[in-house]
Amino acid sequence: FSNSPNPFNADTEITFFLDHEQPELVIVDIYNIKGQLVRSLFEGKLGIGFHQLVWEGDNDRGVDVSSGIYLCRLHTEKVTLFHKMTLLK
């Protein structure tokens, strides 16, 4: 579970691997350093393998967010992980 580039400017690619044979519900959200939800990036069922999502540094309304540290939360039926990302404008 990572993002590249990090730090990033315009957008970043979030990559993660699922090792469960059966498709499972995956939720990927972006939070600011205060713990406030900024963007609901993905919610759906995914199967085994590598997966990639792109975050363009915007909120749920499509407005660009400010520079700072953001936390990407990857939640599945079995685990919840967080990853720190730095947006520099």
Model-derived features: positions:
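Glycine-centered coil/turn sites that cap beta-strands in beta-rich domains
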Residues: 1-4, 8-32, 40-43, 52-55
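C-terminal tail/sorting-segment detector
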Residues: 14, 40, 45, 63-89
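Extracellular Ig-like/FN3 beta-sandwich strand-entry sites
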Residues: 23, 48-50, 67-69
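Surface-exposed loop/turn motifs at beta-strand-loop junctions within extracellular Ig-like
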Residues: 32, 59, 76-78
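Signal that preferentially marks extracellular ectodomain short beta-strand elements
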Residues: 53-65
